[in-house]
A protein has these predicted regions:
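Extended intrinsically disordered or low-complexity segments
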Residues: 1-272
């Protein structure tokens, strides 16, 4: 992603065919096998590093442990370096499924790497780390504070970054404005390189309060969602309203701006 030839985001993933962590008895550790041939690899977190498994030191009735940053992934196992196969207590010597998607600048070289970043382009689930850590602390003190309240509010240490579901390396510093150039490479054999330019739109919200006051606020382009199955790019402009303002109606206006030109347009066209 770039703006006027200035790079904003540059992310490269490496995809392989199926591969396994093979047990090397002479070294008492696992190493990744060579990948098998593959015509296509789905871009899914299930194929990125992560997963769940049993710790050999746990009681037989213990619940499985999960990789906090990607519980549905492949290649991670709980406990000692030799690990156990997810869903069963298989022999150490059995091959263990490895990840097929990794960061090009940080290939996996060892098993059970707790700090390895799950590789993907999709949103991060709210109950995955590091997003979950931003949700705050919900303990007995929090429950007591809201005991007589009509609704439960966020914790005092809640961080609004919790609402950001994009991977950290896909967040544009300073935000988007439109007119950025989007380039995708290597996703399709039939179209090795794809390029699109985001529209430069000014969208403004006219908010009317219950007391008859009006307030005009520019909306921000804050989300770009790429649907590779449908070959569509979805854009979201967002506005946050203060509940205390008692907003009863919102009208939206938009106008296309020349590429590379900032500032508000002189006239608006209503769209809602």
């Amino acid at each position: 992603l770039s703006r006027e030839e200035t790079p904003l985001l540059d992310k490269t993933l490496r995809l392989t065919g199926p591969r396994h962590w093979d047990w090397q008895p002479e070294a008492a550790q696992r190493t990744l096998s060579a990948p098998q041939p593959a015509l296509a690899v789905p871009l899914r977190y299930e194929l990125a590093y992560g997963g769940w498994g049993f710790d050999p030191g746990d009681d037989a009735s213990a619940a499985p442990r999960t990789h906090a940053a990607n519980p549905c992934g492949s290649g991670w196992f709980a406990g000692a370096a030799q690990g156990q196969h997810p869903g069963a207590r298989h022999a150490v010597e059995q091959p263990f499924p490895g990840p097929q998607i990794e960061h090009a600048d940080a290939p996996l070289s060892q098993a059970n790497h707790e700090d390895a970043r799950p590789a993907g382009f999709a949103p991060i689930a709210r109950f995955w780390q590091p997003r979950l850590a931003l949700a705050g602390t919900y303990d007995d003190a929090w429950r007591e504070r809201h005991r007589d309240q009509p609704y439960m509010d966020y914790a005092e240490d809640f961080d609004e970054g919790f609402f950001q579901y994009a991977p950290a390396d896909q967040v544009v510093a300073g935000g988007l404005r439109g007119d950025e150039t989007l380039r995708l490479s290597g996703f399709f054999a039939s179209a090795p390189d794809l390029e699109a330019r985001l529209p430069r739109l000014w969208i403004e919200a006219l908010c009317r309060g219950g007391d008859g006051t009006e307030r005009s606020t520019a909306m921000k382009l804050d989300t770009v969602h790429i649907d590779l199955d449908e070959m569509l790019v979805h854009l979201t402009w967002r506005l946050t309203l203060d509940q205390a303002l008692d907003t009863v109606a919102v009208d939206l206006f938009e106008r296309a701006l020349p590429q590379g030109i900032g500032g508000a347009p002189a006239a608006m066209e209503t769209i809602g």
